[in-house]
């Protein structure tokens, strides 16, 4: 899995507009982060996805987009890994 994560982070770093990313495990602990305040928000991202399960009929976590004046944050869960990506608006 480490190779797969490393490849994903390399691809993210090469995309235009990406200013940060954070990978979180199923306990809410930061596995890897890059960018401003990404690691300090790791538990928050995981908590948001856990709460989003109550908003869907299937009980699956929703994909979340947070839009601000300075960045758009995309949060998604795949298997047991939560990934957030911050991009310029």
From Swiss-Prot:
<protein>
    <recommendedName>
        <fullName>Ragulator complex protein LAMTOR5 homolog</fullName>
    </recommendedName>
</protein>
<dbReference type="GO" id="GO:0008361">
    <property type="term" value="P:regulation of cell size"/>
</dbReference>
<keyword id="KW-0458">Lysosome</keyword>
<comment type="function">
    <text>Regulator of the TOR pathway, a signaling cascade that promotes cell growth in response to growth factors, energy levels, and amino acids. As part of the Ragulator complex, may activate the TOR signaling cascade in response to amino acids.</text>
</comment>
<dbReference type="GO" id="GO:0005764">
    <property type="term" value="C:lysosome"/>
</dbReference>
<dbReference type="GO" id="GO:0032008">
    <property type="term" value="P:positive regulation of TOR signaling"/>
</dbReference>
<comment type="subunit">
    <text>Part of the Ragulator complex.</text>
</comment>
<dbReference type="GO" id="GO:0071986">
    <property type="term" value="C:Ragulator complex"/>
</dbReference>
<dbReference type="Pfam" id="PF16672">
    <property type="entry name" value="LAMTOR5"/>
</dbReference>
<dbReference type="GO" id="GO:1904263">
    <property type="term" value="P:positive regulation of TORC1 signaling"/>
</dbReference>
<dbReference type="GO" id="GO:0061462">
    <property type="term" value="P:protein localization to lysosome"/>
</dbReference>
<dbReference type="GO" id="GO:0043066">
    <property type="term" value="P:negative regulation of apoptotic process"/>
</dbReference>
<keyword id="KW-0963">Cytoplasm</keyword>
<comment type="similarity">
    <text>Belongs to the LAMTOR5 family.</text>
</comment>
<dbReference type="GO" id="GO:0071230">
    <property type="term" value="P:cellular response to amino acid stimulus"/>
</dbReference>
<dbReference type="InterPro" id="IPR024135">
    <property type="entry name" value="LAMTOR5"/>
</dbReference>
């Amino acid at each position: 899995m480490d190779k797969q994560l490393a490849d994903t982070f390399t691809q993210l770093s090469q995309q235009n507009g990406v200013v940060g990313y954070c990978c979180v495990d199923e306990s809410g602990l930061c596995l890897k982060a890059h960018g401003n305040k990404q690691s300090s928000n790791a538990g928050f991202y995981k908590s948001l996805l856990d709460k989003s399960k109550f908003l869907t009929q299937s009980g699956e976590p929703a994909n979340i987009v947070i839009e601000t004046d300075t960045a758009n944050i995309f949060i998604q869960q795949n298997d047991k890994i939560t990934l957030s990506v911050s991009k310029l608006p």
